[in-house]
Regions:
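Histidine- and/or cysteine-centered catalytic micro-motif in compact active-site loops
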Residues: 25-27, 37, 52-54, 70-72, ...
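Charged, gly/pro-rich active-site loop segments
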Residues: 79-136
Length: 136
């Protein structure tokens, strides 16, 4: 049963351009949350996002983060807690680039374009009225 819930959560996350809420600690030490689009995912183990300069500054000070996917129809809540890092490798930035980013950045070489990699340490999944908590 546990693997079924995990598989369903992974399927939800893997949908193309899935939106979620990313919570980070701001420069004053307070939690902040914002919506962000997933670029690529390996199930619930890790996710990547593309972003501008604001989030990397906060991540460099405190790399603890949380990600939440939520929907009312179908009903689910996928909460992941872990660490997030800033990826600066140009080849990875090119790999993560997708249509629509040109509305915010000039190209993968844009110095204000960053890739973030979130790695899950623990999770709380509520899918199909079933809940599962766990750690990696």
């Amino acid at each position: 049963m546990d693997q079924i819930i995990i598989s369903k959560a992974e399927e939800i996350i893997s949908k193309k351009r899935q939106n979620c809420v990313l919570a980070l600690i701001d420069l004053d030490g307070y939690p902040t949350a914002s919506t962000i689009t997933v670029s690529k995912a390996d199930g619930i183990k890790w996710l990547t996002f593309c972003t501008g300069i604001n989030k990397p500054k906060r991540i460099n000070l405190n790399n603890r983060a949380s990600v939440c996917f939520i929907s009312e129809n179908p009903l689910y809540n996928i909460s992941l807690v872990g660490k997030i890092e800033v990826i600066t490798d140009l080849e990875i930035k090119k790999e993560m680039w997708y249509d629509g980013l040109e509305n915010h950045f000039q190209s993968p070489e844009d110095p204000n374009y960053y890739v973030l990699k979130f790695t899950t340490e623990r999770y709380n999944l509520f899918v199909d009225f079933q809940e599962l908590k766990g750690k990696f």
